[in-house]
Amino acid sequence: MRSIAGLHKLKMEIFNVEELINMKPFKNMNKITINQNDNCILANRCFVKIDTPRYIPSTSISSSNIIRIRNHDFTLSELLYSPFHFQQPQFQYLLPGFVLTCIDKVSKQQKECKYCISNRGDDDSLSINLFIPTINKSIYIIIGLRMKNFWKPKFEIE
């Protein structure tokens, strides 16, 4: 069984959904939905799939670059580890360490991961799409992360 720690041996040799599952991309792997036809793992407002992207948007930037949203600059790590995301009630979420480990393994092979923000029409939500190349030039790990109420301040005073 492969784990994130074992990715150094894989060199991103990922070809199917079972290999994605073995990488344990989500906090609770017992609460996922697997779509074998689309090589996709679905969870709360996010997915991880292995596929050839239809297209990578021209607005995508390198995972090492900052992105400007609402006149503020963010790194990908800041978005992934955002307390606005983790303080929301949800039983499942994508592990930021999974994403950053994949990016690190790919960058060691002089390949570039890209990400973009997609506008879904909801001003308070944030949608991130990540494209992580594998050893096969046309196959990517594609991650979609949808954060509802990301921009809506919610505070709980105890």
UniProtKB/Swiss-Prot annotation:
Induction: Expressed in the early phase of the viral replicative cycle. Keywords: Early protein. Pfam families: Pox_F15 (PF04596). Belongs to the orthopoxvirus OPG058 family. This is Protein OPG060. The gene is OPG060.
